[in-house]
């Protein structure tokens, strides 16, 4: 072995180690189903929906759906907490620094706890609701018909397919119908939240857990 070959043999592992370490550090961890009530939670496994239970792990990029009356809570390390409302179907994000979860239908409440420089978003066929830092927000979608985003605390930004954006601060919401322009500004959410029997009933930031639409005494 000549000197050049020997040097290459030393340098190659030295170069690869930091790269491998960086790749391993960036790999997101699996999430956990920390709560499940009112029905079933299923994941798509080899083209078949299979029921999963509280305490089981869920992986990045997995497709999940809840039963007609089920509410499931999922904790994702370095991202936050997701609460799937009844009759919801989602695909969990794949990138730890830009964790975009796709929602085909239903309602998804997101509580983020993101490291600096990271972003999380809920993507629907009509719009994308994105957040950086810490926020509590809920997104409701009716497939390709409409989408609604409501913010409990912090700020989120909703972007339509044509690139138009609207900020949604704490205590406000925005609703977008398919084929319609994004509203110029968000509206106060109080009139909607005070109505029982709405899709917002399961939101844990404003409503009593399992309270069937009952608002928390300190929700304002």
Annotate each predicted stretch with a short phrase.
Residues 1, 25-26:
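Absolute protein N-terminus
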